Structures are given as C-alpha cells and as structure tokens.
C-alpha cells in the first residue's frame, strides 16, 4: 500500500512540473512574439534605426499612437503632392526656425514634435512624443495652456470668424546647462518658450456614422515654440539694426545703445529717465501692456513686431526680447534688459504721432535779425573795426542799425565805480528806503516827489563843488558860520589822545570817544545796523572835521531835499513844530530849569543822574561860541566825571536855524543841573544861544527828512537812550542805574522861558509815553504848562510870523477854521 501511494505522488509531481514548464515556454513564446511585433512596429516608425532599436514596448506603443494620429491628421487635410524640389527643401525648414514644431491634441498630448527640440530643450524627440504636455510644463501655466487648447464649436455671429490664432508664453523643462551639457530630468530648469500657432480642425471623410453616431471633427494645436535666449548667452553678434537697452522696473530707460541714433534719431542721453511707453504706437499699447505683464510673471518675453515712434516723425517696426535680471543674493528682480531688433526703416516720416516728435518741427528758424542780436550779445575782446566787418557782411543788420527819421538818440551813460558802489548800497536797504534813504523804486520815487515840501516854483540850486553833494548850496551857505569855504570831510571818529581843537582839548583827552558814528545815535543790534544804513546820520553827527578816514563822497541821483517828510495818519506819530525861539536875557542869573518838572514826577522811576559844576566848566566857557547840546545815554551803573563838548570847527555851528531830532527816551528821570553856575547850559536839554529867527521855509529839508525817518522807525532796544537835537551834537554817555524799559517816540514841545537880555532859548523835553500828561501838568517857576491835546499840536504847527502857542479863544477860532 505504501508503495502504491508513493508511485502516485511521483506521477503527480512530474505532471505538475511538465505543466509549469509548458506554461513558462508558452509565456516565453508570447513575449518573444510580442517583442517581434514591437520590434517590427518600432521599425515601422519614422525614426532612425539607432533610436527605434532601443525603444521599450511602452515607448513603441506611445510613438506608434502618435504616428497614427499624425497620419490621420494628414489624411484628413488637403495635402498637395510634393515635388522633388519641396522634398529637398524640407530639411532646411527646421534649420531656419529659431525653435521647434509641436502639435498638441485637444487633451494636451504631444502627437508630434520636431527632432531639433534636443537643441533647445535638451530632451529628445522620442522622450516627449506621446506624452502629455502638462508633464513638462510649469504648474502655473496649466490653466493658460488649457485655454489655448479649447476650441469652441458654438454658433458664430454673422460676418465674424472665430479666432484660431494662438500666441502665449510657456515655461517648459530644460535639461541643458549654460555650457550646453545635459543634466538629469529631475534637475531640469524652466525655460520660457514663445509659442505661436493656430488651432486646426480636421473633419473625417467618412460621412457615414459608425456604431450609430458620427465622430466629431478632430482638432489640434500646431505651434512653433521659440525659446527666448538670455542676454548673457547670445551667441550671434548683433548687427547694425539691433540695439540694446536697459530699463528699471517701471520701464524707464537707464541705458540705451548708441545705434538707436542711426535707426530712430534719438540720442541716448535724451531717453534716460523716460518711459518706454512714451515711444509706443497707440495701436500697439494694449498688446505691449499684456506682454510686459507676462514678462514680470514668467521672466522673459518676446514682444513680436510692434511700431515704435521715430524722433522726427513716423515709426519703425521693432521686435524686442526682454529679460528680467534677478539679483543673485536675494533673487529679487533688479532690472530689465531688452534686445531690440529694428526690422524696417522709418515709415511715414512726415506724420506726427506724439508731442515728442513736435519738438524738432516747432524749433525756431534763425533769421538775420537773430544773427545781428547774437553779434551784440556775444562777449568778445574785439575792436570796433572787427565788429563793423561782421555787420558789413549782413546788409539787413546795417539797415536796422541806421537811425530813421524821428528816432530819439539816447546817449549811453557809462557810470564810474562810485556809481556801482552807490547802487550796491541802495540795494542793501530794501524795506526802509521811503524817507531817509534814496529809493531805487520808481513808484516810491514818484510818491516822494509828489510829497516834496518845496513849492513848485522853487527849484533846487546847484551845489558847491567843495561841499557835500547831498546838501543844497543854499542850505549849506546858511550852515556856514564864517565866510570861509565850507570844507566837509566826513570821517569815522576814532579814539585819540590829542584834542581836535584848542577849546576842547582839556576834556577830550579824558573823555571816551565813540568808536563809530553809529554810536552817536543809539545802540542797535548788528542785524539792525545792517538794515538801517545810517550814512546820512554819520555825516550829520560827525565830530571831527579833520579827514582821518574819509568816506568817499558819492553823487546821489535823488537829492534828499526832494523827499517829503513822512506824515502818518494816526495819533502815534504827529507833526511837531520847528524850533520856536523865544527871547532870553543874557544877564539872567538863574535861567529857568526843566529839572524841577522832572523831579516832581519820580513815581517808580529810576534814580536821578546829576552832574556837578566842575564837570560843566568847559561848557560854560564855550557857551557863547556854539550850540551846546548835551545828551546823556544811560548804559551802566556809574556816572562819568567829564563831559564831551563840541568842537568850534564844526561846520554846523554858528547862528543858524535847525530842527531838533526826535529822541529815544531813556529809562530814568532826567535832572537838569545848572545850580552851580548861573550861565551853564542845562544838562539833557538843548540850549540854542545867540540865534536869529529864520522862517520855517528856509529850514533844511534834508534834516526834516532825517527826523521823520527816525520818527517813523519803531525800535525797541533795552538800555539805549538816543537824544538828538540838531546838528553839531556832542555826546556824553554817563552810566545810569536805571533798568531798561520799552521806549516810544513822543511829541517834542517847546516852552517859552522868561528872559531879560533878548537871547533866544529853546528847551526840548523828550519823555516816555506813560509820563507825558504828568510831566506836562507840572509847573515851572510857578507857572504850569498847558496840557495839550492832539488838536492842539496839529493847530500849533509852525506858522509864519508866529512864535507862541495859541491859547483860549485863539485856539477855539483856529479849531473852527480847521473844521
């Protein structure tokens, strides 16, 4: 039993092995037959033998299907029979193209691709044929690719055909390196392809339905794919019809090749900073805008042929390859480099398309008159004979130069350097040149002439040759104390030890002297000194008649006597009277003093500044020789022991009439000290002795203009006291403990003092505004001063032949006449 069972097992084992062996042989036979079929099929494909012999089965099937589709397309189309000449030219078509040919089905399969794809993409033809295009393109381009493959078979409007043209940019895998080597497909980079073509619809010839339905027409997309070369990898040298340009990210020129001048007429310099959109034809702007959008999205574009405007009119056809250059550090876009191919000459060169093209058209043409003007405006070191020779060559220019009948010949006045210096000084006073300084403005000049105080019948007399040109001869003669010639030499006083005259030698050696004429007036800031050029004030207040550093006397175009006094319309600045001289007896032992009026009004005022009798001895000695004007300017905390007196050689001394200057009221109560000596002049007062009355019409209008200008100028300066009472002024600056307060200009009023000897004395009181009424209300030697109103001052203006203020009924009658 056991032996029989063992024999059966062996038989079964042998039978199973035979079946397996037969199965293996059958499978091997099938594979061999299949391989023979694929081998035969591969050799049927239009591929080289070395390629087809190495294809796997899947590749053979893929390529065969693609070939069958292509054959179907070719059979569906109306193909012409090629002759021998066309057959020979077929091999040159791909060489002429800057790309490869690709045919896609409606589902995106690449049924055909030319064999030169390896040259541009690194991938071979059989590696791509039959595959889906979506396997080798950028994922961001898939949606656009599907839109390009879609063909709408819906109803079409009458008279309008469906657009089958396609042009788009596609990023595809590339296995080529910059050196031309091939890399693995996994390390491939993206390369931008400019795909242009159309959708072709193939209708089958079999009109009979198959299997009960009719097949739809087959559509395919035929494309020519042109890769855009990188500017750094351009192998072919650029010809004369090509120029390079670089642009910023907003498409403005940052560089342009010089060859654009020969092609379009533009200079590279005039394009820098200008947008490229300014030079596009209007009909191509939409297409170029979309192209630039694709450039920033995909990195490279080719614009195709578009019209670019020439400089002098017309346009040229251009095709541009633009590439975005990225920064190697941060991979950010940096600039745009364009390779521009000009494919035509200038078309319609006489047609204007933009405003830039009108610049050359509207350029003015030079005429003979312009040439003549250039001869005069051109500055050359040539003599007049050479100029005449040039004009002689232009007959029209000579006729224009010749004067016609009735023409007014104006002689040229070539001023000296002094005139230029004077004009420069006048320009330094742009604001305050209405009264005091000659105005360079014609309007101000006309106003000043209209406001002149001189009557129309009175004409200014010529000036003396040895006098100041700014002074009128008639006024200068009145200012002369003696019959000798008036020699005025305006100098800048300097500190010196020797006296200027024998009469004041004892005092000038010990008394400090101002360093500059501006210190005679008042202390101002450096900025204000620059604004107020006090040349006239320096001349009027100059002490020394000996010329040390003489100023250059310059002729002025406008005489100051033609300038009218400034007449304000408000109550802040009112007209004041001229010096109204009253008789005063020379033998009066105790002349009236104004100090009593000031001593009674000390309410919260600074301490009184006094002057001893010894300090006024020199003043008493010279009281009968000249005007004695003592001005005190409190500036510190001590009082000097000596005063400064006037020089006897002052050109303004003598019996003359003048108008007191306005005063910068100080901070302190003024005390006039004449108690020690009966004939000494009053400190801080103006004493005009031995004077003859002169009518107001003969007063110096230049001094009037100076006074009005100073009264008009509103300045606030701490610790300054400026008192001016005419010409020939002597300054004394004792220190005062008074604090600095704000000062304001006020009216100057004259008071009549009693006398016995007929001498005329005038006291000018200059006071702060807050003490005006109280000072005027004080009594002087038992008789009170009348409190005057604004009408009083207006009515009591200087009247010819009148020396007294109106009182009582006379004042009322005068007011009635005014009203």
UniProtKB/Swiss-Prot annotation:
Q: Which residues carry this modification: S-nitrosocysteine?
A: 793
Which residues, renumbered to this chain, carry the PTM N6-acetyllysine? Answer: 533, 702
Enumerate the residue ranges of region (ID).
577-778
* The protein's assembly and partners: Interacts with the ARNT; forms a heterodimer that binds core DNA sequence 5'-TACGTG-3' within the hypoxia response element (HRE) of target gene promoters. Interacts with COPS5; the interaction increases the transcriptional activity of HIF1A through increased stability. Interacts with EP300 (via TAZ-type 1 domains); the interaction is stimulated in response to hypoxia and inhibited by CITED2. Interacts with CREBBP (via TAZ-type 1 domains). Interacts with NCOA1, NCOA2, APEX1 and HSP90.
What is the activity-regulation note?
A: Induced by reactive oxygen species (ROS).
- Organism equals Eospalax fontanierii baileyi
Q: What is this protein called?
A: Hypoxia-inducible factor 1-alpha
* Record InterPro entries: bHLH_dom (IPR011598), HIF-1_alpha (IPR001321), HIF-1_CTAD (IPR014887), HIF_alpha-like (IPR021537), HLH_DNA-bd_sf (IPR036638), PAC (IPR001610), PAS (IPR000014), PAS-like_dom_sf (IPR035965)
Region: DNA-binding; residue ranges are 22-31
């Amino acid at each position: 039993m056991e032996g029989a069972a063992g024999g059966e097992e062996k038989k079964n084992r042998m039978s199973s092995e035979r079946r397996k062996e037969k199965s293996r042989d059958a499978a091997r036979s099938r594979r061999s037959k299949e391989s023979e079929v694929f081998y035969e099929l591969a050799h049927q494909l239009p591929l080289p033998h070395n390629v087809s012999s190495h294809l796997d089965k899947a590749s053979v099937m893929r390529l065969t299907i693609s070939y069958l589709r292509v054959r179907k397309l070719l059979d569906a189309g109306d193909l012409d029979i090629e002759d021998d000449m066309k057959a020979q030219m077929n091999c040159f078509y791909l060489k002429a193209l800057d790309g490869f040919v690709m045919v896609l089905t409606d589902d995106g399969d690449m049924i055909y691709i030319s064999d030169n794809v390896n040259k541009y993409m690194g991938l071979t033809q059989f590696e791509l044929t039959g595959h889906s295009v979506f396997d080798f393109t950028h994922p961001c381009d898939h949606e656009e690719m599907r839109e390009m493959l879609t063909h709408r078979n819906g109803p079409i409007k009458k008279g309008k055909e469906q657009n089958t043209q396609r042009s788009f940019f596609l990023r595809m895998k590339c296995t080529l390196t910059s050196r031309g080597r091939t890399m693995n497909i996994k390390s491939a980079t993206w390369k931008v392809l400019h795909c242009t073509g159309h959708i072709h619809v193939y209708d089958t010839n079999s009109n009979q339905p198959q299997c009960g339905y009719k097949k739809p027409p087959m559509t395919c997309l035929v494309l020519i794919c042109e890769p855009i070369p990188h500017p750094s990898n351009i192998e072919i040298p650029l010809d004369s019809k090509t120029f390079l340009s670089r642009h910023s990210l907003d498409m403005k020129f940052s560089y342009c090749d010089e060859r654009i001048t020969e092609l379009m007429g533009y200079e590279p310099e005039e394009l820098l900073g200008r947008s490229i959109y300014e030079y596009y034809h209007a009909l191509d702007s939409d297409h170029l805008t979309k192209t630039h959008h694709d450039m920033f999205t995909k990195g490279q574009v080719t614009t195709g042929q578009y019209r670019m405007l020439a400089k002098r009119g017309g346009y040229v056809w251009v095709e541009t390859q633009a590439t975005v250059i990225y920064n190697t550090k941060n991979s950010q876009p940096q600039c745009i480099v364009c390779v521009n191919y000009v494919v035509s000459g200038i078309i319609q060169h006489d047609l204007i398309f933009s405003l830039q093209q009108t610049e050359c058209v509207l350029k003015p043409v030079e005429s003979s008159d312009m040439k003549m003007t250039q001869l005069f405006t051109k500055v050359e070191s040539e003599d007049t004979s050479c100029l005449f020779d040039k004009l002689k060559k232009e007959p029209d220019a000579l006729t224009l130069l010749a004067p016609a009948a009735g023409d007014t010949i104006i002689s040229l006045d070539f001023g000296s350097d002094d005139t230029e210096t004077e004009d420069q000084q006048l320009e330094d006073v742009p604001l305050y040149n209405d009264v005091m300084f000659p105005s360079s403005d014609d309007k101000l000049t006309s106003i000043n002439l209209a406001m002149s105080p001189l009557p129309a019948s009175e004409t200014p007399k010529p000036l003396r040759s040895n006098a100041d040109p700014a002074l009128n001869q008639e006024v200068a003669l009145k200012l002369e104390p003696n019959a000798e010639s008036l020699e005025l030499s305006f100098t800048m006083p300097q500190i010196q030890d020797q006296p200027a005259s024998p009469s004041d030698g004892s005092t000038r050696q010990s008394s400090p002297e101002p360093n500059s004429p501006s210190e005679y007036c008042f202390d101002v800031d450096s900025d204000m000194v620059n604004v107020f050029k006090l040349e006239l004030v320096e001349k009027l207040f100059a002490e020394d008649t000996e010329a040390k550093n003489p100023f250059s006397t310059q002729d002025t175009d406008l005489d100051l006597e033609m300038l009218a006094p400034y007449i304000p319309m408000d109550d802040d600045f009112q007209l004041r009277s001229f010096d109204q001289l009253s008789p005063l007896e020379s033998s009066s032992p105790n002349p009236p003093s104004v100090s009593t009026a000031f001593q009674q009004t000390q309410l919260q005022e600074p301490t009184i500044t006094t002057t001893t009798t010894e300090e006024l001895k020199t003043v008493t000695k010279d009281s009968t020789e000249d005007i004695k004007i003592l001005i005190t300017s409190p500036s510190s905390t001590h009082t000097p022991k000596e005063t400064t007196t006037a020089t006897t050689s002052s050109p303004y001394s003598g019996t003359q009439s003048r108008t007191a200057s306005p005063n910068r009221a100080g901070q302190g109560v003024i005390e006039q000290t004449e108690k020690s000596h009966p004939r000494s002049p009053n400190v801080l007062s103006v004493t005009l002795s031995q004077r003859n009355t002169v009518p107001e019409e003969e007063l110096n209008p230049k001094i009037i203009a100076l006074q009005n200008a100073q009264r008009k100028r509103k300045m606030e300066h701490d610790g300054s006291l400026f008192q001016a009472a005419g010409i020939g002024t002597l300054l004394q600056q004792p220190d005062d403990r008074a604090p600095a307060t704000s000062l304001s200009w006020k009216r100057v009023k004259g008071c009549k003092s009693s006398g016995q000897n007929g001498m005329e004395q005038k006291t000018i009181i200059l006071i702060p505004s807050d003490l005006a009424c109280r000072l005027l209300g004080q009594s002087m030697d038992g008789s009170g001063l009348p409190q005057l109103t604004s009408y009083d001052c207006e009515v009591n203006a200087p009247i010819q032949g009148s020396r007294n203020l109106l009182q009582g009924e006379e004042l009322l009658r005068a007011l009635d006449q005014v009203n």
